[in-house]
Amino acid sequence: MIQPQTHLNVADNSGARELMCIQIIGASNRRYAHIGDIIVAVIKEAVPNMPLERSEVVRAVIVRTRKELKRDNGMIIRYDDNAAVVIDQEGNPKGTRIFGAIPRELRQFNFTKIVSLAPEVL
């Protein structure tokens, strides 16, 4: 469950290392975001000499949360961190590599490019 002011790790090589959520896209009164939701975030920590810089406002899709994800078959998945992938306006990732495991539910939300770049899909 991601809400405004939540800090997230970045799971790609776009140049950002840490994000802070400032808004959840989709509804004006929505309080929490879950896996597959798009957020507006500000970069809190960035890699030097990369295209993305600190204090830049970006869009990102959430790929891992500490809160459990319940599947229809009864399986529960929980990750060790909150992580997101920086995307552009069309929903394509800005980085060329994805780090860590991501859930297969992202394929249902039409983030097939992120799923294809990921080393492990749970």
From Swiss-Prot:
<dbReference type="GO" id="GO:0009536">
    <property type="term" value="C:plastid"/>
</dbReference>
<dbReference type="InterPro" id="IPR005745">
    <property type="entry name" value="Ribosomal_uL14_bac-type"/>
</dbReference>
<dbReference type="InterPro" id="IPR019972">
    <property type="entry name" value="Ribosomal_uL14_CS"/>
</dbReference>
<comment type="subunit">
    <text>Part of the 50S ribosomal subunit.</text>
</comment>
<dbReference type="GO" id="GO:0022625">
    <property type="term" value="C:cytosolic large ribosomal subunit"/>
</dbReference>
<keyword id="KW-0687">Ribonucleoprotein</keyword>
<comment type="similarity">
    <text>Belongs to the universal ribosomal protein uL14 family.</text>
</comment>
<keyword id="KW-0694">RNA-binding</keyword>
<dbReference type="InterPro" id="IPR036853">
    <property type="entry name" value="Ribosomal_uL14_sf"/>
</dbReference>
<dbReference type="Pfam" id="PF00238">
    <property type="entry name" value="Ribosomal_L14"/>
</dbReference>
<dbReference type="InterPro" id="IPR000218">
    <property type="entry name" value="Ribosomal_uL14"/>
</dbReference>
<protein>
    <recommendedName>
        <fullName>Large ribosomal subunit protein uL14c</fullName>
    </recommendedName>
</protein>
<keyword id="KW-0689">Ribosomal protein</keyword>
<keyword id="KW-0699">rRNA-binding</keyword>
<comment type="function">
    <text>Binds to 23S rRNA.</text>
</comment>
<dbReference type="GO" id="GO:0070180">
    <property type="term" value="F:large ribosomal subunit rRNA binding"/>
</dbReference>
<dbReference type="GO" id="GO:0006412">
    <property type="term" value="P:translation"/>
</dbReference>
<dbReference type="GO" id="GO:0003735">
    <property type="term" value="F:structural constituent of ribosome"/>
</dbReference>
<keyword id="KW-0934">Plastid</keyword>
